[in-house]
Amino acid sequence: MQSVDLTEPLEAIKLKHGDRWYLAEDAVHDAEALWQGKANRHGVFMGYETITLAKVGSCNAEARIIQTGKGWWAATSSYDYGYGGAGSAPSVWERQAFLNREDALAAIAEEIASSFAAIAQERNGCSSEKHRSDAKRMFEELRAYKTPQLTLF
């Protein structure tokens, strides 16, 4: 998986703008310049694409991706299941920039797969056998997504 670690330049931007960097529009502009992308005043990239990676029963997994002017891909995940979920939109504060679309999608599929692996093991008052079964199938579909079958021809 090819990617660029943006931790250092993003930390430098935060340091430059002080403790309240997250409120500084100039900090967002500096991060936009790093990515060469257009974001709203909160740093969320404008015009990102949402791609459904897998759907089983009440479980859903999506990637949210955008290619910036630098040719990098920002990617985040969104997933939900019968009694919870998590997600975010791609922003200028993403620490990992992918060099191609396929790697971005594979990374997000892997990230969400690990969440569904944990959900499949839950034994709390909210989970049911159906939830665990659906989560296990989601894990399997997402693992297949990130490791596509190679063909000989």
Predicted features and spans:
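Alpha-helix boundary/N-cap detector
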Residues: V4, L99, D103, A107, ...
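Beta-strand signatures of extracellular beta-sandwich domains
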Residues: A74-T76
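A short, exposed loop/beta-hairpin motif centered on an aromatic-Gly-Thr core
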Residues: S78-S114
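Short amphipathic beta-strand and strand-loop transition segments with alternating hydrophobic
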Residues: N60-Q67
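Intrinsically disordered, low-complexity charged/polar segments
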Residues: Q121-Y145
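Negatively charged, low-complexity tracts enriched in Asp/Glu with abundant Ser/Thr
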Residues: M1-N60, K136-F153
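Short arginine-rich
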Residues: A109-C126
